[in-house]
């Protein structure tokens, strides 16, 4: 998201956490009729506003690993001190590389922080292209582990393709992480906060679109069908809006759709939706879906 909006949300979160002493009981309203689709809501868990409000990833290696979450409270102090003050929606390869996307408020680069299967951390920096946006909202690794997709904030008709940092042998922390290709979308998308592969050529994405003019609904769950599995070159992408994400809270105001994860082992799709106002503390949710 843009730096100014992020700073306002971070300030609100910090203030609310410091002041919150009462428990607010959430009263859920029914989902809107337009929310019907191929993915059916099956449950939800509370999303902690500091440590679970930006993204999530299921991790297969090592075995029995817990799900990983990101939020302003998960950013290491050392990274924040160097200006990397926003973390987006992470992903992990099936072989155990875990990847977090980071951005600064200014500059000409974005960074991916990678934990190898053995536990060591490395940083891979990408220098922005001439027309590339600064933000670094999410990372989605192809099922073969070799290619990583990322996106840009705003209204876009493309996704960016990189070699997967750490997992792809062509990458090195000491060298620039290059963009090698582009996914050319046949329909514009807006404010995509996360994507994850559900198959070799299929992405599921959470959009924070507040306007609704692109697909006739706000905050949509999107599917992007690629013309071929990522191989580092350009591919086409066909975009479909599947349904509106749940927007339920005790508070009224602007919701924020955040990260997304598809767990191939269980077939469960999870999406974080942050509640408005004070309810960011009490009834922000990670919603669960199954395909019907």
Where in this protein do the model-derived segments appear?
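A short helix->beta-strand "capping" segment at the edge of beta-propeller domains
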Residues: 35-50, 69-75, 242
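Secretory targeting and sorting signals
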Residues: 1-35
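Conserved beta-strand position repeated once per blade in WD40 beta-propeller domains
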Residues: 52-56, 87-89, 138, 194, ...
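Beta-strand-rich domains and repeat architectures in extracellular enzymes and scaffolds
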Residues: 44-68, 85-89
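Surface loop/turn motifs at the tips and blade-to-blade linkers of beta-strand repeat domains
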Residues: 44-51, 78-83, 126-133, 183-188, ...
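Structural motif
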Residues: 66-70, 105-114, 155-164, 211-227, ...
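Loop/turn-rich, solvent-exposed surfaces of beta-rich toroidal or solenoidal domains
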Residues: 187-238
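Blade-loop segments of beta-propeller domains
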Residues: 69-103, 123-127
């Amino acid at each position: 998201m843009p730096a100014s909006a992020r700073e306002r949300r971070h300030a609100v979160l910090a203030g609310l956490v410091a002041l919150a002493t009462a428990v607010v009981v959430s009263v859920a309203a029914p989902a809107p009729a337009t929310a019907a689709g191929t993915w059916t809501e099956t449950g939800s868990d509370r999303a902690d506003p500091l440590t679970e409000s930006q993204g999530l990833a299921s991790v297969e290696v090592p075995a029995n690993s817990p799900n990983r979450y990101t939020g302003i409270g998960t950013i290491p102090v050392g990274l924040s001190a160097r200006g990397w003050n926003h973390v987006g929606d992470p992903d992990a390869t099936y072989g155990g590389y875990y990847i977090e996307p980071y951005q600064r408020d200014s500059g000409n680069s974005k960074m991916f922080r990678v934990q190898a299967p053995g536990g060591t951390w490395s940083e891979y920096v990408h220098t922005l292209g001439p027309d590339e946006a600064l933000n670094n909202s999410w990372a989605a690794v192809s099922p073969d582990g070799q290619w990583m997709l990322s996106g840009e904030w705003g209204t876009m008709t493309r996704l960016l393709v990189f070699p997967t940092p750490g997992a792809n042998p062509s990458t090195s922390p000491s060298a620039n992480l290059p963009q090698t290709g582009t996914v050319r979308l046949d329909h514009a998308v807006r404010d995509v906060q996360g994507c994850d592969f559900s198959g070799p050529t299929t992405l599921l994405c959470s959009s924070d679109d507040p306007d609704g003019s692109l697909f006739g609904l706000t905050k949509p769950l999107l599917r992007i069908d690629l013309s071929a599995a990522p191989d580092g070159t350009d591919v086409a992408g066909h975009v479909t809006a599947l349904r509106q994400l749940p927007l339920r809270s005790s508070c009224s105001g602007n919701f924020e759709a955040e990260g997304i994860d598809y767990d191939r082992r269980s077939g469960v799709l999870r999406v974080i939706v942050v509640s408005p106002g004070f309810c960011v503390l009490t009834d922000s949710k990670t919603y669960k879906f199954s395909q019907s």
